[in-house]
Design a protein with these regions (language model features):
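Residues on the lipid-exposed face of transmembrane beta-strands in outer-membrane beta-barrel proteins
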Residues: 37-43, 109-113, 126, 142-146, ...
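Transmembrane beta-strand segments that form the barrel wall of outer-membrane beta-barrel proteins
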Residues: 1-5, 120-130, 231-234
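A broad, low-specificity signal marking well-ordered, structured residues that form hydrophobic/aromatic
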Residues: 51, 122, 227
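Solenoidal tandem-repeat scaffolds enriched in leucines and small polar residues
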Residues: 4-78, 94-96
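Short helix/strand-bridging catalytic loops that position acidic/His residues to coordinate divalent metals
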Residues: 22-24, 139-143
């Protein structure tokens, strides 16, 4: 493991960077190496306004699969006679196979605006991420932190997230062809001749959107104690 951290600041702004590298061995299957770096800054825009942004990059190589995920593949052979207009389909359940490299870039922005009259602060967050697997995602978060008497605060919040699916994601794979068989071993699937190079049915790689609304009620006490109660509808 290795890493470094750099801070360059002045009275109204701050720039920071943090490259790092980790190496880990995935149990049973192979090695994975992650190389990451980040660069960010914060800027005071006014007496009651602060803006910050950071850019993060992650490069991963090696074993990137989830060893607990299986993928269902079906081969509908058009050469076989159909039964009730359906082709005979041979099914296989196999471990997922992801590309050996993954490059991901993420941009995060945050704006805090304080309002004196209601004694409240508005927090706006926006994040955009994309990678070379075809996934693009966006996140929007809005928090209104309202101060009350006796150290109480009430925070209504909203979050929205959306992403599209990876290039090699499908809930299942169906091919209109006979399944490739290993030479000299009839009946055994030849993985090297599959019609796709990578495949996964991991729902985290699927396209989806989600929104949540919530409320947090908190109170600060002496000795840095804090009580917090909240709920969220997802």
């Amino acid at each position: 493991n290795g890493g470094a951290h750099i801070d360059i600041g002045n009275s109204v702004g701050l720039v920071n960077g943090a490259p790092s590298e980790t190496l880990e061995t995935a149990r049973f299957r192979g090695d994975r190496e992650d190389l990451s770096g980040s660069l960010g800054f914060s800027q005071i825009l006014g007496r009651d306004t602060v803006f910050s942004a950071d850019f993060n990059y992650l490069h991963s190589t090696g074993f990137l699969e989830n060893p607990h995920k299986l993928v269902l593949m079906g081969f509908a052979n058009p050469a076989t006679p159909p039964v009730f207009d359906y082709l005979f389909t041979t099914l296989f359940a196999m471990p997922e196979n992801r590309p050996d490299t993954h490059n991901q870039s993420t941009l995060n922005t945050h704006l805090t605006q304080y309002f004196a009259a209601p004694d409240a602060a508005l927090h706006l967050d926006y994040s955009y991420s994309r990678d070379d697997w075809g996934i693009k995602s966006q996140t929007v978060e809005v928090d209104w932190v309202q101060a009350l008497d006796d150290g109480w605060t009430v925070t209504p919040r909203f979050r929205y997230y959306t992403q599209n699916e990876a290039d090699f994601y499908q809930p299942y794979f169906i091919f209109r062809e006979a399944y490739p068989q290993s030479p000299g071993n009839p009946g055994q699937l030849d993985y090297s001749q599959l019609p796709v190079d990578a495949w996964s049915s991991d729902q985290r790689l699927s396209g989806f959107g989600a929104r949540s609304v919530g409320l947090i009620i908190s109170r600060k006490f002496e000795n840095n104690l804090k009580l917090e109660i909240g709920f969220e509808d997802y």
